[in-house]
Amino acid sequence: MGAKPGSMKPSTVARGLGSVSRRTRARLVHVLKERGIRSLDVLAAVGSVPRHRFVDEALASRAYEDIPLPIGYQQTISQPFIVALMSEKLIAGSAGRKTVLEVGTGCGYQTAILAHLYEWVCSIERIQLLFERSENTLATLEVHNVELRYGDGYEGWEGGSNFDSILLTAAPEQIPPTILAQLAPGGCLVAPVGKAADQRLRIVSNKGGRFYEEEGEAVRFVPLVPGISE
């Protein structure tokens, strides 16, 4: 699904579109409403974040279609409906919305959505070139309530704990205990879990130190891979 490693560079990320982008974002919000997204905060975030700035210039005209798109390095930017659905489940299940941990920054689009929903976003990316690209894009868009790290998402956020929410944007076969341990009481974790042909969303709640798990929709994500890639 993704392009070959290194085939997409930060300099090719789309800019411009202006008022066209605003109109197409509004249409995308309407599509998400029709598909069942109800959170006004999530819909407002989708309506505010310019998705075309997170994809290659050649794909900018398709940025507001409800489809995933390649971002290089065998990775994709998720379908807007899935981004909205996971974000909606995340905030609905979380007692607080101060801090959120995202495992898998990718191009930074989901990160930007979370920045509209939480006071502070911590995000880890294992692919160095994607980390650099997302850092540059978010800085250009003046998204300042985020901290990005290049590292192994399997290990969670070094020195961090008690996140109100945790979101995984790649699928492990089982949720790593190191990540689950960083979820605060009253917090919610949302992740795609399973092998490629059999993945479903998992919604995990921390209720007084005990974890309760709920199964959600069938999804398809790239696998969560341990380690880092230069």
Predicted regions and their residues:
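Conserved nucleotide-cofactor-binding alpha/beta core module
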Residues: 89-212
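Class I SAM-dependent transferase core
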Residues: 2-101, 109, 113, 117, ...
